[in-house]
Amino acid sequence: MAREFSLEKTRNIGIMAHIDAGKTTTTERILFYTGRIHKIGETHEGASQMDWMEQEQERGITITSAATTAQWKGYRVNIIDTPGHVDFTVEVERSLRVLDGAVAVLDAQSGVEPQTETVWRQATTYGVPRIVFVNKMDKTGADFLYSVGTLRDRLEANAHAIQLPIGAEDNFEGIIDLVENVAYYYEDDLGTRSEAREIPAEYKDKAEELRASLIEAVAELDEELMMKYLEGEEITVDELKAAIRKGTCNVEFYPVLCGSAFKNKGVQLVLDAVLDYLPAPTDVPAIKGTLPDSDEEVTRESSDDAPFSALAFKVMTDPYVGKLTFFRVYSGTLDSGSYVRNSTKGKRERVGRILQMHANSREEISTVYAGDIAAAVGLKDTTTGDTLCDEKNLVILESMEFPEPVIHVAIEPKSKADQDKMSTALAKLAEEDPTFRAHTDPETGQTIIGGMGELHLDIIVDRMKREFKVEANVGAPQVAYRETFRASAQVEGKFVRQSGGRGQFGHVWIEFSPNEEGKGFEFENAIVGGVVPREYIPAVQAGLEDALQNGVVAGYPVIDIKAKLFDGSYHDVDSNEMAFKIAASMALKNAASKCNPVILEPISKVEVVIPEEYMGDIMGDITSRRGRVEGMEGRGNAQVVRAMVPLSEMFGYATALRSNTQGRGTFTMVFDHYEEVPKSIADEIIKKNQGE
């Protein structure tokens, strides 16, 4: 099977947004116009093409990022639909990792919202070029230029309108293209026929002003254009497009478009912009990786002739074909039925069949080429973030980093007979989702599951019931507290046991000190003259790492500290690794009294949107939850309150907010950072943990 679309004519894009900005509807319309769907599915009716897990259709939100392929004007566009709900941030991270560009969808009434900020930051981390689609222009309170302003103010993004809406709310009739200087009016409800006309007189001045500022902004990124612009020469449409493309691909410029996916306006222009401004796999820098046995860096060019390399970015269990592994090919080609190397795990894998996905239908293909996104059937050991490569040319592509869970609950099957079934279900779900963890508490024997928020765990429990037919009871949520040191001290740890024959002897002096936030545990060996022999150093480090997991104050893992091993002693006969391991853990225990240990709790960034009359109640409620209000602003006819609130105080907030605002308030929350717990609360936590 020969290559159908050249690499230059391939686009791998994601569609990212805040919950409810209309992302799934936008994707639907793209599939409709590119000829993959014959009838448009509405999210409100629960019949959307991309939302194919039962729960997604019920809740009207997108949880798993389905990858789908479409064609537009002779190009292949691979689309990854990413969830906008904050509990599924990992899905967004893993899809951004394999994209070349993205369309950020905003709600024309709200502009940039908290989850938009989170997703935007993730996209910046991975250097993903973006175009912005301001959707829902038909909605009451829609304001295009306000939305463009929020991109600049809240995200400090160099964003500029390349379109201007004609009318808004109910009078939204068409779109002015500022690049080509023409107005498009829609002639039918499906938006397939539009007519290009002259820009209406009442919009001429505004369009000219915006076009001038667009040209100026783009010229700043391109010296040749700058010279032409300063000399007052006319800049052609092609030159302008090329400059916007260059700025966008370099992640220095963000073109902003407008429309209403629900009313079928503006989506084809978004597709055109994807082809015009977002990069092909050949436009992005070649992917870097390392050799498995050394840390030597190698690159893989985006070409069919290079050795095969791919990254697995999603694992799913499919009722018909079993385990599906979604992967992005960075270089080379792969035939179904062939063998590849999973270099991350050092295992050989056989690719049974290769499927190209279209939301929930699939087409079997025999070969995938560089730049393609597809799903493989038959991989046994591959999980999210693993590299697959040619057996003779090994490489490990950079993997993804997944956040630790911030909330834990105990779970047990409703009937004891289901215990094994539940264990299997949890193992499968953890394989699909790296931010979900399941383990057995060694002390209580309970099964504990952890995730990114209440909704995340609700959906896991729900999926167990539907997909694995296991009903479970869930305990009260537990917060993932941490501990750290606020002071430095030098401490001794000595373990001596003499009982006839061979004894045990380990002796260390360690200096503990606070580390920067987020840096984790750092161990330094500063032994001189072999007072602790080199072969025991790893045992000291391992002993500390084990002991850190059990905490020093209330049994929570200790984070962000440095430990410097600087002195100690040993015994020729009695010293062994075990003794030094125990000595190190004793040193950590002794540090508890000297290093001023504190308990840390996860703090969430919360944004509440409410009608003005509930403002007082909500502010009072946030303060009673130990929250700090960071800012307030009007948005349309609602008020937005932004606050930092401890996660432990936010359980059940959805219910409280509903009753406080008669169901008219909404909120979103994102884990932000760890902060010290006030003394009174720390005492309660310690008492509770000792009482157990």
Swiss-Prot record:
Cellular component terms (Gene Ontology): cytoplasm
SMART domains linked to this entry: EFG_C, EFG_IV
GO molecular function: GTP binding; GTPase activity; translation elongation factor activity
Domain tr-type G: start-end pairs: 8-282
GO biological process: ribosome disassembly
Residue numbers binding GTP: 17-24, 81-85, 135-138
Disulfide cysteine pairs (residue numbers): none
Cross-referenced InterPro entries: EFG_II, EFG_III, EFG_III/V, EFG_IV, EFG_V, EFG_V-like, EFTu-like_2, G_TR_CS
Origin: domain of life: Bacteria
Function summary: Catalyzes the GTP-dependent ribosomal translocation step during translation elongation. During this step, the ribosome changes from the pre-translocational (PRE) to the post-translocational (POST) state as the newly formed A-site-bound peptidyl-tRNA and P-site-bound deacylated tRNA move to the P and E sites, respectively. Catalyzes the coordinated movement of the two tRNA molecules, the mRNA and conformational changes in the ribosome.
Descriptive protein name: Elongation factor G
Organism (species): Bacillus licheniformis (strain ATCC 14580 / DSM 13 / JCM 2505 / CCUG 7422 / NBRC 12200 / NCIMB 9375 / NCTC 10341 / NRRL NRS-1264 / Gibson 46)
Gene name, Swiss-Prot/TrEMBL: fusA
